[in-house]
């Protein structure tokens, strides 16, 4: 499991990206690169990293479910994810 501080840091980045998205788009459109540089570093969407909602694991992230592969498998086997069942052929 990821440290709580890492999860919190990622949430903080997401809030900053959302807050400055409109301003960032306007500055980009105007070509004001100095203005862009004055914005906080973490307000750039490039700095976001997908993490598992339950464990905070940064690797093996399944975008469709918002979970890491480990948690996805566990929850799917328990039948906690609607519409997902084990393949058989």
UniProtKB/Swiss-Prot annotation:
It comes from the Bacteria. Signal peptide: none annotated. SUPFAM superfamilies: Glucocorticoid receptor-like (DNA-binding domain). InterPro entries: Ribosomal_uS14, Ribosomal_uS14_bac/plastid, Ribosomal_uS14_CS, Ribosomal_uS14_sf. GO terms for cellular component: cytoplasm; small ribosomal subunit. One of its GO terms (molecular function) is rRNA binding. The keyword rRNA-binding applies. The keyword Thylakoid does not apply. It holds the Pfam family Ribosomal_S14. One of its GO terms (biological process) is translation. Residues 32-51 are annotated as: Disordered. Belongs to the universal ribosomal protein uS14 family. Binds 16S rRNA, required for the assembly of 30S particles and may also be responsible for determining the conformation of the 16S rRNA at the A site. Part of the 30S ribosomal subunit. Contacts proteins S3 and S10. This is Small ribosomal subunit protein uS14. It comes from Christiangramia forsetii (strain DSM 17595 / CGMCC 1.15422 / KT0803) (Gramella forsetii).
């Amino acid at each position: 499991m990821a440290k709580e501080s890492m999860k919190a840091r990622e949430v903080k980045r997401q809030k900053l990206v959302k807050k400055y998205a409109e301003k960032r788009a306007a500055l980009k459109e105007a070509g004001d690169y100095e203005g862009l540089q004055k914005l906080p570093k973490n307000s750039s969407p490039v700095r976001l990293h997908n993490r598992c909602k339950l464990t905070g694991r940064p690797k093996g992230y399944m975008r469709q479910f918002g979970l890491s592969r480990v948690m996805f498998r566990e929850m799917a086997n328990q039948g906690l994810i609607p519409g997902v069942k084990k393949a058989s052929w």
